[in-house]
């Protein structure tokens, strides 16, 4: 059985737990997998525990093996993920992550699992290689297919009867692996939130996937005779089809309320009054500039989901800035800044009311584009109390969503400096506390 891309959406967790428990009551041997992105700090209890509550819940599910997604590998600071699995009752498998000391101590590159009947299953796992972001977080992420081919040369793996890939790589890479690496027998996929309700077959390799947010739970039945596969059945079961129990809503609410309670115990500051949404956006940009030592900033007001409270706690700040994003800094000339502004502002009206998803954004809509350190109007830039020569370099700070999302080609084509480890709300918190 398998789940993936829960992203701290615990709404279906009670159903998944019952499904796992009920389908484990069998004479057949059962393995339970999590294929990554279980953790997402947009949930207050995940945020306050740095993901450790997710591991506790995975333990309660009886997970046997797991791998990581980008929300663990990038969404968590290196120090956080190095602590994440200390109390895990399951093994983490990951074959394409290193640091200067070598492989992470909390993961194995592969596992050879021998069934009661003596059939040897090779379990391998890889996460999507976001090179630009793993590096600043202190990791070296390797090409997944090259790593897979190298691991397949290991005598233990080569001698296995059946090879299963736990893939947080996305559907396109899964299909590519199925075509190029015939040694893999089964790929359990994730990352792109795709669903294979009855599985797929590509070049003789079986593919399974179970969506996102717990909207499906995966079940794969494997039959072996003399250590060779004789039958396979793949299913992704919609959790909406599973029975609810009256305690489910209270359980999910308790997780959220407990997170908010723990965050609320930490007062950040007392403001003279409750600021407006625009004033909050201005404050966020000041924090960004201070943290990044930048001259200029651009954000969208939709980053501030709700205005800051006057007596601002970490719970309030989490509600206002729930996003899983950091800062990116560029060095630009006046001409380059004009190009960037034209690119962003020409799309501003179109994006304003769009419900944005992904790339770390956890708000409702994009909102208006605002600036700090300069104004842009009618294709012209006016700097705040500063004369800028045409060839002078200035530093511009943005949220990294602008860098990774497909909207702004003027940014994606440039080399930016990604700033780790703090998330946006951590940057704002430090600014308000006077710690920058």
Q: What function would you assign to each model-found segment?
A:
Residues 66, 296, 394-396:
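Hydrophobic beta-strand segments of well-ordered beta-sheets in folded domains
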Residues 1-239, 277-282, 287:
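Acidic, metal/ion-coordinating pockets
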């Amino acid at each position: 059985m398998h789940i993936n891309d829960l992203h701290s959406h615990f709404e279906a967790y009670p159903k998944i737990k019952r499904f796992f428990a009920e389908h484990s009551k069998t004479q057949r041997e059962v393995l339970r997998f999590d294929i990554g992105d279980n953790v997402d700090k947009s949930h207050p209890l995940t945020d306050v525990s740095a993901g450790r509550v997710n591991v506790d819940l995975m333990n309660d599910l009886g997970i046997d093996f797991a791998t990581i997604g980008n929300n663990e590998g990038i969404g968590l600071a290196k120090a956080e993920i190095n602590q994440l699995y200390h109390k895990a009752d399951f093994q983490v498998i990951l074959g394409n992550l290193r640091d200067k000391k070598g492989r992470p101590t909390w993961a194995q590159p592969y596992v050879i699992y021998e069934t009661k009947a003596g059939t040897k299953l090779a379990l391998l796992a890889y996460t999507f290689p976001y090179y630009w972001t793993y590096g600043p977080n202190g990791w070296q992420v390797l090409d997944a297919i090259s790593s897979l081919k190298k691991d397949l040369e290991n005598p233990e793996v080569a001698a296995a009867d059946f090879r299963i890939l736990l893939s947080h790589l996305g559907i396109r890479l899964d299909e590519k692996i199925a075509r190029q690496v015939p040694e893999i027998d089964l790929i359990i996929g994730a990352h792109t939130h795709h669903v294979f309700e009855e599985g797929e077959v590509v070049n003789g390799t079986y593919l399974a996937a179970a969506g996102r947010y717990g909207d499906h739970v995966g079940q794969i039945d494997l039959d072996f005779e003399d250590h060779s596969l004789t039958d396979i059945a793949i299913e992704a079961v919609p959790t909406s089809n599973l029975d609810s129990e009256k305690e489910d809503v209270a359980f999910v609410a308790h997780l959220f309320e407990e997170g908010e309670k723990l965050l609320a115990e930490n007062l950040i500051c007392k403001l003279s009054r409750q600021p407006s949404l625009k004033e909050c956006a201005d404050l966020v940009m000041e924090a960004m500039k201070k943290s990044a030592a930048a001259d200029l900033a651009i954000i969208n007001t939709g980053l501030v989901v709700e205005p800051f409270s006057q007596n601002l706690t970490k719970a309030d700040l989490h509600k206002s800035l729930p996003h899983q994003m950091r800062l990116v800094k560029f060095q630009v000339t006046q001409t380059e800044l004009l190009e960037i502004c034209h690119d962003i502002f020409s799309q501003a009206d179109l994006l304003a009311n769009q419900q944005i998803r992904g790339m770390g954004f956890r708000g409702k809509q994009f909102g208006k584009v605002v600036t700090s350190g300069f104004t842009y109007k009618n294709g012209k830039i006016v700097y705040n109390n500063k004369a800028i020569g045409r060839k002078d370099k200035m530093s511009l700070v943005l949220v990294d969503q602008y860098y990774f999302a497909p909207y702004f080609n003027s940014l994606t084509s440039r080399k930016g400096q990604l700033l780790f480890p703090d998330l946006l709300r951590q940057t704002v918190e430090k600014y308000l506390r006077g710690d920058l």
